Amino acid sequence: LDRSSAASDVYKRQQVLNSIDSESTNPIPVIYQSGYLTIKGYDEEFGMYRLGFPNREVEEGFVRFLLPYYANVNKVESPFEIQKFVREVRSGDYSSFFRRLQSFFADTTYEVIRDQELHYENVLFIVFKLVGFYAKVEYHTSEGRIDLVLQTDKFIYIMEFKLNGTAEEALQQINDKHYALPFEMDERKLFKIGVNFSAETRNIEKWIVEEK
């Protein structure tokens, strides 16, 4: 999954948009010709088309379509699972949220996961991208770690995910780097959550929470 193609507009030349063959590894022409992407602009100087999702409904539908291919959830259950995620973060039930997230990684065979770290990041990206249609989400990745800020009307979640480390280290980083400082005067309840991913079990192993 190229997360940039699911996160923002992309630029492609016309010959790329019209070229689909069995040897091509570029998903953009297929996505474009399937109707998920539309032309939003054209750069005459470089002959590049700017592509993007025509509206929120189409973008959400596309990301929902991806979910069963990356997580342990079937196509029928997928929309309902995301609804449960959203309800849990809106109600402050982070334990149920993470148990549900664990189930998304369960029973995924080692053969399916060619790049374990990339697979983990892709699943998290898709889940939080979908949750982001209903709550404010800021998501960043960098060298084996993911930091996330998720906001609802009543709650703020600051999460640090360690792909090679401990939940304690993840929570310590939130505190050491003062990730919660911008929300110091916010009246909403704040959760600082450190999470680690186990290479042995290929799943979320532990999460630690500090509440404000």
PLM segments and residue spans:
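Single conserved hydrophobic/aromatic residue that forms the stacking wall/gate
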Residues: 1-7, 11
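A short, conserved structural fragment
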Residues: 34-42
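Short, amphipathic alpha-helical interaction segments positioned at domain boundaries
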Residues: 52-83
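Acidic-basic catalytic patches of nuclease active cores, encompassing PD-(D/E)XK
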Residues: 103-136
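Conserved catalytic cores of phosphodiester-cleaving nucleases, focusing on short active-site segments
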Residues: 124, 148-163, 177
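Active-site metal-binding core of divalent-cation-utilizing nuclease and nuclease-like domains
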Residues: 127-153
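Domain-level recognition of nuclease-like catalytic cores that cleave nucleotide substrates
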Residues: 182, 186-212
